[in-house]
Amino acid sequence: MDGMLRRRGGVIERLLHDGDAPVLVRVAQPEPRRVVFGARAVSREAAAYGIARMRFALGVDEDLSGFRRRFARDPLIGPSLRRRPWLRVARRPEPFEALAWAISEQLIEYERAAAIQRRVLAVLGRRWVGWDGAPDGLRDLPATSVLAGTEPALLESLDLAQGRALTLRRAAREVARGRVDLHGSDHEAGWRRLRAIPGIGSWTVEMLALRGQGRHDQLPAGDLGLLKLVGRLLSGGDPRALASESQVRAFFAPYGEWAGLAAAHMIEL
């Protein structure tokens, strides 16, 4: 709904960046067990980077056989797992994208957050310009250095709340200056530094981890959908019941390192 992904026929298109180099990635699935990736960029290195990030976003290289074997007969997620063994967590190609959009989605309904995201892309986003010099319409998130220098008042004019505008700029500054390495292997170190920023709590970091860093063990337990789901299940079906965050964590504890993926299967119950 943010407009960053475009579908033309059976092909999806996405604009990404390897540093400052734009990469247009196209993905198609001509057969059930075959996915084809292609990219246009100024260098082979940039094209390879864009393809790698889209492979991550779509989870095509993940081995979920252990998850399927372990939980195929689970009374809660087993039916979904048998019906949709291909289901993956909805990921973002870039971890900062997952972080930035999680900040924009805090405490508001998703439709409003998506509208804010579209405005950010329209005003600040990077555009794909075709080889003929004409704009193509695809946009990518602005560079972290751009967001780090954006006045909060401009972000507020796009309907981002004042506190979240400040949080987004501070997070972008930490990443742009290299103090937080979202692509690094030590995720926890980055999370600790991000948690020191006012406005970034457990839910935001867990959304980054799950959707931007591929951490299936991370569960955004404060998510309203999960609070409602677990509340309903624990109450015997009361649609108005809300669980606590600690109850959500306890509920998903049996799924261990797969808690985030288990939640993706369970959220539609």
Positions of PLM-derived features:
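HhH-family (HhH-GPD) DNA N-glycosylase catalytic core used in base-excision repair
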Residues: 1-269
